């Protein structure tokens, strides 16, 4: 008997599923997974974030939120638990992929981000506890940096270009999501392709 053809779901659902799969994977040295928690952040905080982010993912897929708005709202919604930063980096990767309807579209979309997107990104950083280099002239925790973004008309993409030499997620934005593409290619090469899971 053949298996019925099943839709892989909306992009928002796929992003949510990716977040759930990532955190429940086994054997992630140094990271939270189903067998390892930190004192102040646990698996259930990550699971909560994946659920709480869904409306933002759906709004991005529908095109009703800008990148900056979606980043700020995703962080605000997922701060409803006490576990601190759970998915900031995942949001930076997934939101453009959802809005761009895949890697090719995301690669073009990120280049069109605005100064307002950059300001909202900095505000999102302020809502979480992401560790950053404090000696950086564009320190996300320094209120003067937001004014600099406005004064110098620095877009979100420019922020990522600036950060790319020392930040893997920023590098994904500026190199066409190369690691994301490689991981996707590996998954599609598995028996079953999109239905491998």
Where are these regions (language model features)?
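Phosphate-rich cofactor/ligand-interacting catalytic cores and adjacent structured alpha/beta frameworks
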Residues: 1-65, 101-197
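Long, hydrophobic/aromatic-enriched structural stretches that serve as scaffold segments
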Residues: 57-105
């Amino acid at each position: 008997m053949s298996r019925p053809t099943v839709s892989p779901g909306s992009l928002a659902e796929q992003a949510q599923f990716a977040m759930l799969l990532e955190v429940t994977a086994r054997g992630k040295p140094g990271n939270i997974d189903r067998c390892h928690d930190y004192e102040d952040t646990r698996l259930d905080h990550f699971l909560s974030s994946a659920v709480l982010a869904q409306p933002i993912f759906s709004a991005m897929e529908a095109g009703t939120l800008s990148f900056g708005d979606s980043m700020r709202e995703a962080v605000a919604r997922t701060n409803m638990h006490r576990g601190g930063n759970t998915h900031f980096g995942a949001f930076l990767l997934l939101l453009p992929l959802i809005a761009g309807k895949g890697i090719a579209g995301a690669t073009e979309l990120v280049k069109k981000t605005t100064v307002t997107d950059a300001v909202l990104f900095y505000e999102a950083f302020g809502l979480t506890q992401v560790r950053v280099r404090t000696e950086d002239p564009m320190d996300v925790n320094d209120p003067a940096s937001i004014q600099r973004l406005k004064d110098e008309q620095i877009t979100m993409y420019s922020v990522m270009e600036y950060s790319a030499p020392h930040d893997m997620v920023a590098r994904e934005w500026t190199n066409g999501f190369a690691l994301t593409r490689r991981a996707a290619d590996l998954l599609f090469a598995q028996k079953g392709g999109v239905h491998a899971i």
